[in-house]
């Protein structure tokens, strides 16, 4: 355990909350102290849900630890059933409550409530949020789903969408439309939008569509074994992946692999003349493994970017991500420490970052364009408009989202040609972003030589005064540095300063800049 300002995943009980909140007719009783009762904020503020999540807390306090916390939990279960009358109850403990080792499942069973009780045992100090969601959905399926007669029409279940998921609402709509167009009915969407009664009829479908492996792969594997339902392995993010998904679904359903591509614009937008400036742009990707693997394929094969780095924070999927990274000649970064991610980005100096909300913060600090491709996300990534990531419309949305942060081709040429112009300068940012442009810095006045000194003895102008041996840049070197493209300028500055420090120099001139360039080019 370590202290951090940011975490990509919460503890496992947050994953359980995401499953419970996405469902209807299910109530989650969480054994937790007062400090762990923050679910309302997560779902009502960030996701803008119009109702509170179906979660009740025991909210035990310090004084309860000297008495019977088991009774506190059982009373919370009774109250939750009497007040909400759910079809099923899910019980578990938060990371803090796990320390007192109350048997929440046994305590709930002892009440003999007239509804099914789903037990959760989530190892809070070994696993995290996505595992919690995956395990919770698995236990719900084990408890409620039974083999049953198949539907007359070929049908499938859509598995994986949860509350607080990245564009899950719109992805479900897009994929449902795609499946219906192929003549395949959707039996149940779960966990989001389903009730315990719906879970009970999961077995009626002929196969399962697994949209989000992080939150439903265990349930899909269980259904394959217990309910004899195969499941899809392709996640339909991007044009190529969506076409592969259609072919896979058609094979499972025994239908023709047909799809309406009339709304698909991404391939032409990517190939049009105005998009030639995208070719070869260096991009770094980080997020959950599913979205990163899909995004890397889009970036290289469909948009023409160069993938220079990729990684994920969920260690459960480190193996498939490492395998995918090898296809790009890369070593995957597997970490849940945002500082390591920031170091990797600084070292690679990409032109675009595709990541989570944290990478958006990193990009802002480093002055690099960024687009969000994966949870965790903040409130602005739960848009009011229809904005899927999956299917053909998702491919259109992805193209617009990724391209928007970049400076367009013509403007890049203007920046190169008129670098000191009042309108086209590096600090102004892309003109299509709106907001007030930062005025170009006024040219620094060059220092004059001391009286009586000859031109040869004149001291070159200094960009900043040195203090206590600090390395400073002379104005001519600073001006030369600005000729380097802005997306690699930071790396050039760091390398030059490192070179100067190794040589014992306190002032960097043009000569130092080019010596450093030659040194690191070897």
From Swiss-Prot:
Subunit text: Protochlorophyllide reductase is composed of three subunits; BchL, BchN and BchB. Forms a heterotetramer of two BchB and two BchN subunits.
Binding site for [4Fe-4S] cluster: 36
Catalysed reactions listed for this entry: chlorophyllide a + oxidized 2[4Fe-4S]-[ferredoxin] + 2 ADP + 2 phosphate = protochlorophyllide a + reduced 2[4Fe-4S]-[ferredoxin] + 2 ATP + 2 H2O
EC number: 1.3.7.7
GO molecular function: 4 iron, 4 sulfur cluster binding; ATP binding; metal ion binding; oxidoreductase activity, acting on iron-sulfur proteins as donors; oxidoreductase activity, acting on the CH-CH group of donors, iron-sulfur protein as acceptor
Provenance organism: Cereibacter sphaeroides (strain ATCC 17025 / ATH 2.4.3)
Pathway: Porphyrin-containing compound metabolism; bacteriochlorophyll biosynthesis (light-independent)
InterPro entries from the UniProt entry: ChlB/BchB/BchZ (IPR050152), LI-POR_suB-like_C (IPR013580), Nase/OxRdtase_comp1 (IPR000510), P-CP_red_C (IPR042298), Protochl_reductB (IPR005969), Protochlorophyllide_Rdtase (IPR016209)
Keyword entries, A-Z: 4Fe-4S, ATP-binding, Bacteriochlorophyll biosynthesis, Chlorophyll biosynthesis, Iron, Iron-sulfur, Metal-binding, Nucleotide-binding, Oxidoreductase, Photosynthesis
Pfam families given in the database record: Oxidored_nitro, PCP_red
Its job: Component of the dark-operative protochlorophyllide reductase (DPOR) that uses Mg-ATP and reduced ferredoxin to reduce ring D of protochlorophyllide (Pchlide) to form chlorophyllide a (Chlide). This reaction is light-independent. The NB-protein (BchN-BchB) is the catalytic component of the complex.
Taxonomic placement: Bacteria, Pseudomonadati, Pseudomonadota, Alphaproteobacteria, Rhodobacterales
Amino-acid biosynthesis in keyword set: no
Manner of cofactor binding, per the entry note: Binds 1 [4Fe-4S] cluster per heterodimer. The cluster is bound at the heterodimer interface by residues from both subunits.
Cofactor entry: [4Fe-4S] cluster
Gene Ontology biological process terms in this record: light-independent bacteriochlorophyll biosynthetic process; photosynthesis, dark reaction
Domain of life of the source: Bacteria
SUPFAM superfamilies cross-referenced by the UniProt entry: Helical backbone' metal receptor
Disulfide topology: none
Residue segments, region Disordered: 426-464
The name this protein goes by in its record: Light-independent protochlorophyllide reductase subunit B
Compositional bias per record (Low complexity), positions renumbered to this chain: 455-464
UniProt xrefs under NCBIfam families: DPOR_BchB
Binding-site residues for substrate, renumbered to this chain: 409-410
Active site feature: 274
């Amino acid at each position: 355990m370590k202290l951090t300002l940011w975490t990509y995943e919460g503890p496992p009980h947050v994953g359980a909350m995401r499953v419970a909140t996405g469902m209807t007719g299910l109530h989650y009783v969480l054994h937790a102290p007062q400090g762990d009762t923050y679910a309302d904020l997560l779902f009502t503020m960030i996701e803008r849900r119009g109702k509170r999540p179906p979660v009740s807390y025991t909210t035990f306090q310090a004084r309860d630890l000297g008495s019977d916390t088991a009774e506190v939990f059982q009373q919370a279960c009774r109250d939750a059933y009497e007040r909400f009358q759910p079809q099923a109850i899910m019980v578990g403990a938060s990371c803090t409550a796990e320390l007192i080792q109350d048997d929440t499942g046994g305590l709930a069973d002892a009440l003999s409530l007239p509804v099914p009780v789903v037990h959760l045992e989530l190892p809070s100090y070994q696993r995290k949020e996505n595992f919690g969601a995956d395990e919770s959905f698995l236990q719900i399926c084990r408890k409620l789903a039974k083999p049953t007669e198949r539907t007359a029409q070929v049908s499938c279940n859509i598995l994986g969408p949860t509350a607080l998921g990245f564009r899950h609402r719109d992805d479900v709509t897009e994929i449902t439309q795609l499946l219906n167009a192929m003549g395949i009915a959707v039996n149940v969407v779960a966990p989001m939008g389903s009730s315990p009664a719906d879970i009970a009829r999961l077995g009626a479908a002929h196969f399962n569509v697994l949209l989000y492996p992080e939150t439903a792969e265990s349930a899909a594997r269980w259904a394959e074994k217990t309910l004899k339902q195969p499941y899809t392995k392709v996640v339909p993010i991007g044009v190529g992946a969506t076409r592969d998904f259609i072919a896979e679904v058609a094979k499972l359903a025994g239908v023709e692999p047909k799809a309406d591509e009339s709304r698909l614009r991404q391939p032409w937008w990517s190939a049009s003349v105005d998009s030639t400036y995208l070719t070869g742009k260096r991009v770094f990707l980080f997020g959950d493994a599913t979205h990163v693997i899909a995004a890397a394929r889009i970036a290289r094969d469909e948009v023409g970017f160069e993938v220079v780095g990729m990684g994920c924070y969920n260690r459960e999927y480190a193996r498939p991500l490492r395998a995918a990274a090898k296809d790009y000649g890369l070593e995957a970064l597997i970490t849940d420490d945002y500082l390591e991610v920031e170091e990797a980005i600084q070292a690679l100096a990409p032109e675009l970052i595709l990541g989570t909300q944290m990478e958006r913060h990193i990009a802002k600090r480093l002055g690099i364009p960024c687009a969000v491709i994966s949870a965790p996300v903040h409130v602005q990534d739960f848009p009011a408009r229809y904005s899927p990531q999956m299917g053909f419309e998702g491919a259109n949305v992805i193209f617009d989202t990724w391209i928007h942060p970049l400076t367009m081709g013509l403007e890049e040429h203007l920046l190169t040609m008129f670098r000191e112009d009042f309108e086209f300068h590096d600090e102004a940012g892309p003109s299509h972003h709106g907001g007030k442009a930062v005025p170009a810095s006024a040219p620094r006045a060059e220092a004059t030589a001391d009286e009586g000194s000859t031109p040869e003895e004149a001291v070159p102008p200094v960009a900043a005064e040195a203090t206590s041996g600090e390395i400073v840049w002379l104005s001519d070197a600073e001006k030369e540095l600005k000729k380097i493209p802005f997306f690699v300028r930071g790396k050039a500055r760091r390398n030059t300063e490192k070179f100067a420090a190794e040589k014992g120099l306190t002032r960097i001139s043009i000569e130092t800049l080019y010596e450093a360039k030659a040194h690191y080019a070897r």
